[in-house]
Amino acid sequence: MKTILSLFDYSGAWSKPYKDAGYDVVQMDIKHGQDIRWTYYLDKEVHGILMAPPCTAFAVSGAQYWNAKDQDGRTVDAVALIDAALRFVALYDPEWWVLENPVGRLRRWLGPPTHMFNPCDYGDPYTKKTLLWGKFNIPKENPVPPQKVCKQGSWIQKLGGSSDRTKELRSMTPPGFAKAFFDANP
């Protein structure tokens, strides 16, 4: 059985196609009590690694707060999480690996992304420009037009709010993309 590490995966949305197909999915998230900076070596061969680290220090939607986050240490903490995630890649040398984050300043630390997409490129009718870094096969697109559900745009903008629940909903991997990624990277 192939093992997939799914880091920063509270919802399980991105790893769901792998789990449904019978893969051994090791899902890790701080909200499940696992801080990847303190995760010990797993004595198993890892086939692939999915990584969706928190975007709050990097996303362009929060650019007005970047200076404050740089000054108070939140950016350093966020970069440390990226470093810890990439340590898994070096440790396990998987067949493929991918790190996801919305458009923002993460490219300052990781360089140019490997791929960029919107959920509507993979069958989910909304936009949220997302970047991917890593070594993986680019998923086959299944484009649909985005639906505008409010004057701000998609349901993502309509959510608003800063509660944990709305943040979780905004950060969930779109199911169309998750399935397309699985199909391209079995």
Language-model regions, residue ranges each:
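Conserved active-site and SAM-binding loop architecture
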Residues: 1-186
